[in-house]
Amino acid sequence: MAVTMDGVMGHLHHASGSTGVVFCSPWGFDALCTVKFHRLVADDLARRGFPSIRFDYPGEGDSLPVEEGATFATWVNAAVRAAAELRRRTGCTQILYYGMGIGATVALQAGRQDDKVAGYMLAASALSGRRYLREVALREKVIEDGIGIDFGYSPGSTVLASFIMDPRLAADLKAVTVAVDTVSPNLPVLVLARPENAADRDLAEALGAAGASVTCTDFTGYGAMLDGVVTSPMPMALIETIGDWFSRAIPAEAVSRPSDAVEAEPMMLSTTSFREQAEIVDTRLFGVLCQPASGTESAVIILLNMAYAPHNGWGNIWVDTARTLAHQGIATFRVDLSNI
């Protein structure tokens, strides 16, 4: 179920349990490659009684752009807002924050602001913004050297596989770091460690030394998942392992759904030039209809993606295209193909 909240697009997975899960995704290309994985994890958790919400950071994916540029605080505030929306719509009372990549830092910072944090799941964590930016730059250099093309990005840009980070956010990240010894003692934490990455296992040890109840497991399939979206290898055994950990470590008592949780609320995002609404086609396909703000359109274009790329497209190309066309009076429908 799609939801909107202060210009942010999210996806809610209903369940009746008292513990909800907020998904804090990685950035850019990594987020593109893990949409399906996170959907499958959220679906499995919902079957086990854990409601959850996935969302696009402000200025990313389907969420509205930030007028003066996104900051790291903007992202953390979006995670806090997503937790409030999850509580409002499902009645869950405590939140476990899941973060992957730089999203692990978002998750930890959001959890610090939640007096009913239930725990954390941290996957392929990047807890130093400066180190993360260096890794992004190295990955992009490998891509550009491999294909021998100069894309003409502005000097100093933070880019990965056609995704360009907001300069204000990149500047913010240089000063962002998280000290794990501030995690509350006895909180359950699941660490998904990349094979042959000592930093992930060091993180698990540091969390344990700080008093957290830590489980560390291999992030099997990590490399294949982030290799692109031409194929869609999913680590189904890992998804089962994650679900089993939740069932063991987190209470899943049922709660009553709040009376103001109205599923018929319109999922609308709008600006002075366009308005967008999430649509479900034949109960199977998800897409976003983008129309001119005037309500008058001269044509409708269907935007389809290649392989397993979600509807926002590489570098958010279809989101940008749809909103540009809406300004010119043309409506579009960008859609996820089956099994995304």
Model-identified regions with their sequence ranges:
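The alpha/beta-hydrolase serine catalytic core
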Residues: 5, 114-243, 252-253, 259-264, ...
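Active-site signature of alpha/beta-hydrolase-fold catalytic machinery across serine-
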Residues: 109-113
